[in-house]
Amino acid sequence: MVTYIVIFVLLLIAELVYFRIANKCNIIDKPNERSSHTSIVLRGGGIIFLIGAWVWSGFFGFPYPWFLAGMTLIAGVSFVDDIRSLPDSVRLEAQFASAVLAFYQLDILHWSMWWMIIFALIVYVGATNIINFMDGINGITAGYSLAVLVPLALVNMNEDFVEQSLIISTILASLVFCVFNFRPKGKAKCFAGDVGSIGIAFIMLFLLGNVIIKTQDVTWLIFLLVYGVDGCLTIVHRIMLHENLGEAHRKHAYQLMANELKIGHVKVSSLYMAMQLIISLGFIYLCPDNVACHWMYLVGALVVLSLAYVLFKKKYYHLHEEYLASLKK
C-alpha cells in the first residue's frame, strides 16, 4: 500500500511539473469549429500514462521490457505529433512497430500463424485509433479508462493473468489525470492529447491481450464495447456520408450529447463510464463462466448498444446538420 501511495504522489508531482513545461513551451490545444471546447487548454497531460508505466517498471523490476519499449515508442511519437503534426504514415508505422513489440512481449509472434498475427496487428492498431478518436470531451478518457481498468483488476485478483501492480499503477495514473481533466466544460486544466489517448489505449489493449491469450476467449474485448460501438458505427456513418476519415469531426454520439444537446461534459463522460462498468461487471459476475454464454452476452450487449446508437442518431443527428449548415452562412 505504501508503494502505491508513493507512486501516486510521484505521478501527481510529475503532472504538475509537466504543466510548467507545457506552459513554458506553449504546448496548447486551440479550439476550432470541430472542437467540443471553447477555450485554450494545455495539451499532452496524458503523458502521465507513459510516466506511470516507467515509474511502475522502476518500482517492480521491469517485468515487461518489450511492452515498455512499445509504450515509449508509440507515446513518444504521439507526443511529438501533439506538438507539431506528423504525417499519417509516420504515426501508423510507429503504431504497428509498437504493436509488434507488445506481441513479442505477449509471446504470440509465431509465424506459422502469420495470417492471424497480421489480422491481430490490424485489430490492435485499429482499436488504438478508435480509442484515440473517442477522446473529445473533458473526462471521457480518464473516466472510461477507469471503467476498463477496475473490472480488469477485479478479474485479475483471482486469476493472475497479468501483473496486478501494472493495473493498479495505471489506475493511479488515471486518477491523477482525473484530478485535472474530469471537470465541466471550460474548467479542465489539461487535455490528454494523442500521447494520452493512444498511450492508455496501448496499455489497456496489452492488458486485455494477456487475458484473452491465457483464457483463449476473445469475448473479453467486451471491456471496450461502449467505445467500440460509438467509434465503429461513427466510422460507418462517415463512410456512408463519403467523408474523409482523416478530417476532424463532431459526429460521435457523445459529441452530439455534449455539443448539440448541451449535456455537460462530466455527465456524458459519467454516462459512458457507467455503461461500460455495468456491462463489464455483468459479464464478470452475472454471466456463466463458459465461452458459449460469454458470446451470447457479448452479442446481446452489442445489439442493444448498436440499436441505441442508431435510434439516438436518427432522432438527434439533424441538429448536427443544422450546426454544419450554420458554418457555411
Enumerate the language-model features and the residues they cover:
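"…together with the soluble PPM/PP2C metallo-phosphatase catalytic core" -> "…together
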Residues: 1-232
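Cytosolic, membrane-interface loops and tails of multi-pass inner-membrane proteins
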Residues: 16-42, 235-266, 328
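Membrane-interface capping segments at transmembrane-helix boundaries
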Residues: 20-25, 185-186, 239, 308-324
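Membrane-interface starts of transmembrane alpha-helices
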Residues: 87-91, 193, 263-271, 292-293
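Small-residue-rich transmembrane alpha-helices that serve as helix-helix interface/gating elements
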Residues: 224, 293-309
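Alpha-helical transmembrane segments of integral membrane proteins
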Residues: 251, 259-282, 287
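Extracellular/periplasmic helix-loop-helix junctions in multi-pass membrane proteins
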Residues: 281-299
